Amino acid sequence: MEDLIKNDILGEFKFKNGAWVRLMDNPVLNSKGNLKLVIQDTNKEGILDIQREAYKTYLQNEERYKSCVTDYLLDYYKWNNEVFMNSVSGIDETYYKDVITEEKLFTTMTLWYLFICRDGSFGYAFGCCWDKENGIAVLLSESEPRVISRTQLENLHKLNDNTFSLLIHDNERYWTTWDELSFFDETIRVQVEVEGSVEDGVNNAQRKAYNDYLLHKTEHLRRLGNFLLPTYLGSKAEADKFIAAGQQVGVKDVMPSRLVIDKKGNYGWICYTQWDDSYLGILLSEKDIHIMEVNQLRDFAKEKKMKDEKCGYLFREHNFWSQTILHRFFKGEVNTMRVAIRTYDKNPTDLQLQKLSEFFQYDNKFWEPMKDEMLKYYLKFYKDFEDDLEIPEELTPKNVNRENVVSILTFTSLFIGISGRIAWLCESPTEEDGLAFEFTDGKVELIFQPEII
């Protein structure tokens, strides 16, 4: 077949990179010059009738598409503003989601071409500054336009399902759609990711899981608030009193971003955590909420894990069993922390699990004695490290106190050794090998980290 063809309906095209390409008659939105028309033909078999009809449909509705696409892009930008803000440097407050304008939005992206897929689906493809590899696209040919990635448009796989409605594959692992969720005083969009290949589609366990989620999603938000409350109050006992009194709890620092449903029907949210500008996996499909790393949620059915009645899920990691927990050290900022139980090639012992369970029952009663231990250590060894560090005035022996001395610590993990010894491990500028706060019989002792690990 020739590399140049002329069609009465479509015009004259040149074949390039698996598609027929030509310039259209006019610019569209913020395209640089006349908009490019790209018609997919990977195997160079010629333009299909369904693609010609798709182009006619586009021309008949072009003005409507141009008028609505900006609204869809603005909504998408607002729902994904954290991703943009974290990916692009040198931006100012005019790009915040509450004040973003159409003019500002189009400084972040450029319309490249109208793309017509082999099945007649079509949409606008954009380059964007926050994802240069995958870009962004608006699929226009559906009953309601859908914002997807440019790579999804160019390798489009669609599935119309009675439970999920229109699903679009991400060309990696998931079928995707969107759901809306009332979150405090706003409505947020949660991307739904249903595990499955292009060939396999989705299964009944996943449909059942999604129906269950839709039925209980408001309840899941309430459960999440109750789960987080002990961390914020610093006491499980206080949290239980609060909840027993019927008071409603909401935590805005943890915002659902994605709903992941695996092949077995396990499901949970991937939540944005404001305190560390990161993400956390939250399993929702069981009676109790469990938090974990994002990849542990995504691979939940495949992960090597165990569930303890008191401690919850533990995941196998090399010579350890690990768990993700949340803590507010000294009633400061919330931290996402890791429990590490050293077992080598065995399962945790009853003693190790008992120590972990007992630790959770102390309701942060350790924090005050930890301050005393740290101050005692600091004053005792001050002469050993004062020449090696730049000591601020407030941390000199004259001014240091039990409240500010702990500011030099960075906690890294809660460690449980083979023998059942348990301690918070932390980094300190005063000790190259780190410090540890060991808990024994309800008491705290500060030791050098190598003594326990």
List the model feature ranges, each with a label.
Residues M1-D92, D161-I243, D308-P392:
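Long, contiguous N-terminal structural blocks used for assembly/anchoring
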